[in-house]
């Protein structure tokens, strides 16, 4: 009898609320109006309405029944949020989802970002992950630009008694809809807020970044993960190895580690070493050392690599004294010297012009049983060439070729550029021939420097041979090659040949300069051909 009476009273109160809503909305304006804030202290009328809707949902009323009962009610944001929180427990999460969709579809209501956040929290806690992902994606794709789902999820995290998994799903959804930079920003922000995201989230973010060919972003994400103590698994490492392959850097890193360790390293060591060197190359020395320390603590790189990287970092900063101290400590602790570390010292000495010290280090290196490699010799060749030791540069280039190593194109070009004596030009040309037979690929600058050297040494025939060798190799001679040839031909009295190459030059749309015209004019004047000298002069004036 008492329960029947209580139901009758509630029905009468409900009829009163509905009639008031229909006749005079202003009387309950604070309840039914749209509001972005949840009312923390709903009045009695509001409470009755909330209770009534909640009971209907608990009874699993159909959408049609709900629409019939509440057709005249104006659902505010605060009302929706309060009702959703009534169903925040896992066992009632489906009612929360039903109410969210009913209010959206039947009432044609555009939910606020806070309603989305509350519903997502409730669904994740109940492990209704497919529905949660769908709502996250819908919110990210359809919400106004000024709405921030991250803020709303953080603001409603405690009140909804949620779980950190919600933030993993959020970042994963950002990745899947290709909002990759935004997803990374959210990833960093959540880590800064104290949430530890899962390695699955890390893998999802780097996987989609890699598929989108944003390799730089992949490395930034991986670096951030290590910094925030989110450590990779086998899948992470597999993705990162694929990225190294796509970048064409895998062999480079593997070779580097072979020189440091003398043996092949695990894929995880390859990836982590590559990360530290990448950060170092960006001159972020402090960050690289912090990363290295963390990797060493987790045994994600070996000590030999750690010491070698620290030596490299100190040398990169120009602090050779500290670099040498670290190297000595490395040896004292029983680690072997390696070709990479020695080459670091050789490079710095060559850059500073202390080529004799670089040569001494090479001797020390070989006496220690450590074999120099191509980069060691490239540094020496470039150093000797830059600082006027052309014979020494040629000597080390010959040593390289004899040992079956190949000079880099840049080092070879620097050496050829420095030679001045004709005998050294011939020597350089012989080295080029041997190197080409072994697979060396010269560029235009290689031929340009040699052609200039032969012309300055009055060997025009050899210069012309190199010109036609360029043509045979499908290399297009540039301005410097034509300038050297034409000026050289004119200087040795072959003005007709000089004019022939001027015509070829212009036919290839390469503009001659004043030096070329002056050489032709002087050559014609020298043989008394005033007519052609005037013609070339007039042409020079017209093109200016």
UniProtKB/Swiss-Prot annotation:
Please provide the Gene Ontology terms (biological process) for this protein.
Answer: Group II intron splicing; mitochondrial respiratory chain complex I assembly; mitochondrial RNA processing
GO CC, alphabetical = mitochondrion
Q: Where is the transit peptide?
A: 1-116
Name the UniProt key words of this record, in alphabetical order.
Answer: Mitochondrion, Repeat, Transit peptide
The segments carrying the PPR repeats are 163-197, 198-232, 233-267, 268-302, 303-337, 338-372, 373-407, 408-442, 443-477, 478-512, 513-544
The entry's localization annotation reads:
Mitochondrion
Q: Which family does it belong to?
A: Belongs to the PPR family. P subfamily.
- Note the PANTHER family from the entry: OS03G0856100 PROTEIN (PTHR47447), PENTACOTRIPEPTIDE-REPEAT REGION OF PRORP DOMAIN-CONTAINING PROTEIN (PTHR47447:SF28)
Indicate what this protein is called per its UniProt record: Pentatricopeptide repeat-containing protein At1g66345, mitochondrial
């Amino acid at each position: 009898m008492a329960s029947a009476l209580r139901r009758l009273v509630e029905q009468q109160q409900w009829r009163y609320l509905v009639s008031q809503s229909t006749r005079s909305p202003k009387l309950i304006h604070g309840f039914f109006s749209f509001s972005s804030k949840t009312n923390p202290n709903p009045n009695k009328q509001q409470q009755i309405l909330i209770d009534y809707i909640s009971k209907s949902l608990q009874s699993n009323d159909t959408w049609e029944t709900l629409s019939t009962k509440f057709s005249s009610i104006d659902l505010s944001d605060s009302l929706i949020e309060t009702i959703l929180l009534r169903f925040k427990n896992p066992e009632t999460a489906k009612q929360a989802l039903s109410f969210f969709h009913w209010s959206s579809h039947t009432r044609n209501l555009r939910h606020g970002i806070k309603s989305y956040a509350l519903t997502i929290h409730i669904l994740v806690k109940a492990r209704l992950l497919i529905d949660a992902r769908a709502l996250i994606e819908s919110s990210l794709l359809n919400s106004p630009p000024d709405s921030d789902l991250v803020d709303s999820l953080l603001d409603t995290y405690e009140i909804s008694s949620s779980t950190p998994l919600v933030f993993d799903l959020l970042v994963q959804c950002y990745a899947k809809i290709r909002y990759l930079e935004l997803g990374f920003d959210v990833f960093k922000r959540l880590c800064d807020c104290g949430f530890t995201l899962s390695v699955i989230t890390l893998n999802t973010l780097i996987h989609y970044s890699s598929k989108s060919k944003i390799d730089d972003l992949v490395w930034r994400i991986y670096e951030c993960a290590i910094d925030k103590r989110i450590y990779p698994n086998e899948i992470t490492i597999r993705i990162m190895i694929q990225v190294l392959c796509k970048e064409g850097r895998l062999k480079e890193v593997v070779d580097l580690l072979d020189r440091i360790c003398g043996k092949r390293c695990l894929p995880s060591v390859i990836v982590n070493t590559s990360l530290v060197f990448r950060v170092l190359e960006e001159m972020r020395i402090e960050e690289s050392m912090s990363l290295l320390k963390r990797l060493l603590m987790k045994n994600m790189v070996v000590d030999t690599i750690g010491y070698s990287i620290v030596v490299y970092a100190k040398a990169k900063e120009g602090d050779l004294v500290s670099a040498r101290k670290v190297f000595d400590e490395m040896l004292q602790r029983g680690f072997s010297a390696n070709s990479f570390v020695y080459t670091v010292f050789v490079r710095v000495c060559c850059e500073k012009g202390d080529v004799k010290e670089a040569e001494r280090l090479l001797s020390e290196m070989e006496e220690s049983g450590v074999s120099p490699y191509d980069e060691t010799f490239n540094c020496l060749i470039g150093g000797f060439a830059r600082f006027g030791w052309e014979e020494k540069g040629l000597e080390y280039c010959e040593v390289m070729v004899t040992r079956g190593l190949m000079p880099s194109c840049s080092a070879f070009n620097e050496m050829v550029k420095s030679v001045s004596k004709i005998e050294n030009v011939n020597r350089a040309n012989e080295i080029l021939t041997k190197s080409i037979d072994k697979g060396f690929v010269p560029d235009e600058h290689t031929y340009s420097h040699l052609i200039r050297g032969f012309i300055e040494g009055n060997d025009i025939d050899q210069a012309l041979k190199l010109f036609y060798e360029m043509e045979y190799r499908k290399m297009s001679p540039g301005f410097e090659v034509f300038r050297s040839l034409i000026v050289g031909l004119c200087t040795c009295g072959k003005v007709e040949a000089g004019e022939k190459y001027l015509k070829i030059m212009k036919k290839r749309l390469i503009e001659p300069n004043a030096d070329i015209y002056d050489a032709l004019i002087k050559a014609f004047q020298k043989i008394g051909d005033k007519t052609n000298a005037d013609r070339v002069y007039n042409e020079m004036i017209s093109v200016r």
